[in-house]
Amino acid sequence: MPLPLRTERLVIRPYREDDATTLHEVFGSPDVMKWTPSPPSKDVAETAQRLARTMAFTARQPPGFGLWALELKDTSEFLGQVGLFPVEGKGPEVEVAYELAPRVWGHGYATEAARSLIEYGFGELGLERVVALILPDNARSRNVASKCGMTLERPGRFYGLDLLVYARTRPRLTW
C-alpha cells in the first residue's frame, strides 16, 4: 500500500517503534480489547511487544496488506489501529479491521478509515470481497460495517471466537 493513505480527516501510516506508548491506550483498554481475541496489555512494555509482533506480521504480508496506525491528519493525534489482511493470517478472505481508543469513539473515524481501506482493496488490490468479523454484541462495530456498505451474511468461527461475518462485494459495472 502506498502509505501514508490519507482521507478527509485521517492518515493511515506504517507503525513506528515509538508508537507503543500511544498504542497502549488501545491495547491496554479493557473496553477495546473485550471485542478482540486478545486480553488487554498490562503495561506499555507488553504493548511494545505486541507492536513488534504487529509490525512483523505486516512485514510478512503481501504488498498492500497489514495493520497500521491511524491518526488525525491535522494534528497527528494517534487514534488507533486499522488493517486489511487475510482472515486468520491465511485467507482466502480479506478482513478489514479497526480498533480505536475509546476517547475517539462516535466521531466517524472508524467508518472513514474502513471505507478508505475497502475502496483501496477494491481499486488498487483488485479484491472482489472484503469482510469484517464482529462479535455479536459489538453494536458499534456492526454499525461501522453497515455504514461501509457491508451486510450481515452469517455467523462463523474465527480466531477461536463465534463471530458475525459482514461482507461487501466489489461493485460491478452495468451497461
Give the location of each predicted region.
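Conserved beta-strand-loop-alpha-helix junction that forms the acyl-donor binding cleft
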Residues: 132-142
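Short alpha-helical segment within the catalytic ATP-binding CA
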Residues: 99, 112, 140
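GNAT-family acyltransferases
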Residues: 1-103, 116, 120, 124, ...
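Conserved active-site tyrosine of GNAT-family acetyltransferases
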Residues: 145
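Glycine-rich acyl-CoA binding loop
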Residues: 106-111
